[in-house]
C-alpha cells in the first residue's frame, strides 16, 4: 500500500508540477525530463517520461539483484513499474501555473512524502534512489536520503545546462525540501523509549 501511494504521489509531482516548467529535481525522472526536452524536435512531444524511466532502470536492476538480492529487487521492480504506470496514466497539467516558488515548495513536499512512503516499505522506485540505497550498504554513516541529495545534485547541473539558471536554483530548493520531508517521515515512524529507574534494589531488578 505504501509503495502504491508513494509512487502515485511522486508521479503527480513529476507530471503536474516539475515537468511543465522544466524543474529538474534529480532522479531518473529528472533525467527523463531532460531527455524529453532534448528529443522534442526528433520525436513528437519528446520521449515519454515513463519509457525513459523504465529503460534507465534495467542496468540498475541487475546491480540490485547482485548486491541486495531478489527480495529487495522484487519490491523495487514493483515500485519502478508503478511509478512508470502513474507517469503514463496521469495527464500533464500545470498545477502551479508556471510559479517556480510554488512548484519548488509544493512539489518538494509532495515528492518527499512519496519517497518516504516508498522507503518505509523497504523499497525504492528504481533510479537514483535505488542507486543511493545500494551505495548506502557500503557507507552506512550516511543516510539514503543524504546520498540521494549528492546524486540528484549532479542531475540538477545537467538540468542547468538544458533549462537555464532559474529552474536549476528552484530545483535545489525543491530537493532540500524533499529531503527534509522524507527524512522526517521516516524518522517519525521509528519509536523508541528509554526509562531511568532510580532504586536501592538495583540488584533485584537486574536479576
Place the predicted regions along the sequence by residue:
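Terminal membrane-proximal soluble interaction domains of membrane-associated proteins
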Residues: 204-207
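Core subunits and conserved enzymes of cellular information-processing
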Residues: 1-202
